[in-house]
């Protein structure tokens, strides 16, 4: 599927709240985002750059009709889409918050897919490795 390069994440989860209040944004480091974009473009891979929703419940998104708060989940996802969210996952916001607290760079790249098989993760892995190599090279030249 198409790659999602995440610039920031909606903090729709609880873990990151144990590090800093919810008012603090969960954002990727711009150098990591740039390196991921450059790598995906160099490999000729379809990709989108944007915001992700980080959530606590996998099945709340995949099967909201089996929840006691079905309409709330559907309404919230619709709001995130209207705001420009391109994907949903369960880790990025906490990763970005912890990276901010530790003053280290972090980014996120995911494979977007809907129904059916996910397919190979090789393009994602190769893109991430190429981006990390670019970051290392940039650090060595700085």
List the model feature ranges, each with a label:
Residues 1-142:
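Accessory terminal and edge-of-domain segments that mediate assembly/interaction
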């Amino acid at each position: 599927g198409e790659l999602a390069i995440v610039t920031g994440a909606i903090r729709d989860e609880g873990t990151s709240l144990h590090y800093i209040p919810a008012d603090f944004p969960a954002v990727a480091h711009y150098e990591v985002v740039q390196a991921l974009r450059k790598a995906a473009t160099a490999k000729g891979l379809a990709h989108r750059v944007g915001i992700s929703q980080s959530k606590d419940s996998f099945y709340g998104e995949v099967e909201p009709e089996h929840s006691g708060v079905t309409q709330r989940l559907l309404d919230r996802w619709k709001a995130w889409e209207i705001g420009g969210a391109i994907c949903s996952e369960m880790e990025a916001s906490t990763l970005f918050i912890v990276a901010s607290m530790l003053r280290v760079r972090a980014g996120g790249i995911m494979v977007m897919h809907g129904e059916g098989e996910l397919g190979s993760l090789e393009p994602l892995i190769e893109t991430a490795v190429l981006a990390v190599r670019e970051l290392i090279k940039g650090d060595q030249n700085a």
